[in-house]
C-alpha cells in the first residue's frame, strides 16, 4: 500500500525537492554604503556563511549529504549530494579540495538510475572539469537519451522524461534531463544535433496557446498552468537551441551572410513564454520556493535579461534570500517542501553565486517597443517571420563570453546580459546617470543588427535618451563593439551617424595595421582578412570598434569557435574565416578590458553630474589646473573624477570646474592654482617662459603631479624620456628620485588611516620590449623632485589619468581605477599638508 501511495502523493513533491582659505581635509567617518554596495557586501557574506553551513553538515566519513527522505524513501541516492556539490563548486570551492574530492568521488561511484540524479551528476562533473569524469559524463548522456519516453534513441518521437517504470512524462524530470545533456555537451560529450532538434520539437508541441507549460502535458484552457514549469519550458527552448552545433540561419561560411538571418522556429514560443512569465512573476511560486528561485536564475542567465517582466530579478532575488538566512548560515525560504535546510540552502546559493557572475558584455536592445501592460512587452519592429532587428543572432553574445571566459580569462565564469532601457522609465539626466552607473559593471557594450536604428536623432537635434546613455557610458570608461549583421549597409550607415552625434570631434577610421587590437591576445596573420575594421579614438584610447563586415553569423555557431586540443582550421577550410572571427573578437575584448575581470553583478558606479555642482562661489575651494602640452584636453574627466572621489571620501571642499581651455605652461593663470596636473602623451619641449612659469609656481608652494598616459609603448618611452629631461633642466641640482615606500606621502597618517602600500598596475616586461600581459599587485612606484624637504614634482611613469576615467587597454602600462584614485588622493592630500 505504501508503495502505491508514494507515486501518487510524493512524485510531484520529490520532483521539486531534489531539484531543489586653503581648504583642509579632515578625517571623515566611513561613508554609509550605497544601497547597491551594501547589497553586494550582504550577498558576499551570505554566500560565505551558506558555504560554511553546507560544509559543516557534510557526512565526513562518506563525503555526502544524503538524508533519510530523498536517499531512502524516495530512492534518489545522490540527489542531495549532487545539488550541494554543484552549489559549492559555483561558490568557488575547488574540486581538488579534499572535502570536495570526496563528494565528487562518491557521486562518480553511483550508477545511473534516476533522471534527476543523473542530470545533476553531469552538471557537477562538467563544473568540476576532472578529466577522469569525462567517460561518466558521456555514459550519463547516452543513458538520458536512451531513457527519453517514446524516443527509441532517435527512431521515435521524444515525449519527455519521467521516473523509472512510469510512462507519464513530466516537465520537471524533463528539465533536469536537458540540463544534464547540455552540461555533457559543454564538457565535450558527443550529442548529435538531431537530439537537440527533438527536444525543441517537444517543447514547442507541448506549450499551451496562452504561453505556459504544465507539469504534465495536455489539458485545455489555463488548467494546470505552472510558473515553475513555464520557466523550465522557456529554458528548455533556449538550451536546445544552444546545444546545436549548426543553427538554422543558413550561413555562408565564406562570407558570413545568413540566408535565414533572425529566423528561429522557437521565436514565437519564446515570446509567448516570456510574456506569460512576466505577467505572472513571483518568487513565491510552486511547491518549493527554493526550486523556483533557482529556475528564475537560470532563465535570467540563459535569456540574458536583467528584467523579467518589470522585475530586476537578480537584485530582488538577492534581497529576498539574504533576508531569509539564519544565524547558522542556512537559508530557509519556507515550510513544507522547503523545510530541508540543506536543499533550500543549496538552491539559494546557486541563485546567489551564479547570478552574481560578472557581466562581460551587454547587448544593447533597440527598436520600437510597446509595453502591453501586465508585465508583457512586445517588439513592434519585427519582420514577417519574427525577426527582431537588434537580436537577429540569439547566441552570438553568449558564445563570445564563453570563448573569452575560457581562453582570455583562464576559465573564470563570466556572463552576458541584454541591456534594454525600453523597459524602464528614463526621462531625465539624473536617471541617465543612474542607468550608466549600473551599465558600467559591463566593460563592453555590443550593438548590432539590421536596418536603421530609430533612436538615432537627426543632425543638429538634441541627443535622445538612448544616445545620452551611450555617450555617457563611453565617457565614463565603457567600450562599444558595433557590427553590421550580415554586412547590412543600412545598419552601418545608421551606426556611423550615431557615432557622429555622440562624438562630433572624433571619427570612425580604419584601424591601421599597427593597432594593438590586431595582436592584443591572438597573433594570427589570418586576422588580416578583417582589415576593414574601424575604430574611434577618444582621449586615452580606442573607445569604439565597428565592423561593417559580417561577424555575428560566425559567433552564432559553436562550430567556428576554436577549441582546445583541436588543430586550427587552415586557409580554404570552411571553418577558417569563422575561427578568425572568434579570434578577432577575443582581441577586441582583450583590448577593451585590459584582461581585467569585470566587477561582480550589482556593482554600481556613482557618476557626477557637472550641471549640479559649483554654482556657488569658488573662493576657498581646492582647484586643479590641467596643463596643455599640445593636446587640448587629454583625459578630460580624470581630475573631475579624482576631485569627486576626494569630496565624497574626505571633507575636502573641491572645485569641479575646469579652466577652459586648459592652460599652457606659460599661462599667467597658473599662479591661481597651486596644484597642477600633466597627463603626458606627447614629448615635452618646454623652454624659456614655460619652464620659468611652472618653476616659479612650484617654488611658491605649488606642486606638479604628472603621469605618462596610455599611448602605445613607443610613445610612452618618448614621453617618459622627455619628462625626465625637463625635470633635469628645471632643477639641475635636484634630480628626479624614487619616492620611498615609507615616505609621509604614502603613509597611513596622511591617507585617513590606511597607507598606500599596494596597487594594481601593468608595467613593462622584464625584457623592456612592451607591457606585461596582465595587471599585478605592486608596491606604488612614484618618483619626485624634492626641494627644501618638499616634493614639488610627483611623477608616475605608469598611467594615472586614463585609469581615473575608467579606461582600460591591453597595451596601456598603468593602474586600475581604484589604485589611481588612491595615488591621486594621496598626492592631493600631501599638497595640502606640506
Locate each region found by the language model:
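Bacterial N-terminal signal peptides
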Residues: 7-22
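Short alpha-beta junction capping motif
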Residues: 168-170, 439, 444-492, 675-720
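An acidic, glycine-rich "communication" segment
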Residues: 487-587, 593, 601-604, 618-623, ...
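Internal amphipathic alpha-helical repeat/solenoid segments
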Residues: 54-80, 96-113, 417-433, 657-664
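Solvent-exposed loop/turn segments at secondary-structure junctions
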Residues: 60, 112-115, 127-130, 150-152, ...
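Structural recognition of the beta-strand scaffold that forms the well-ordered cores
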Residues: 86, 121-123, 144, 178-179, ...
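Aromatic-Pro/Gly-enriched surface loop or interdomain linker
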Residues: 357-444, 448-454, 458, 551-552, ...
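An alpha-helical repeat/solenoid feature that recognizes helix-turn-helix modules
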Residues: 28-49, 64-99, 110-142, 146-197, ...
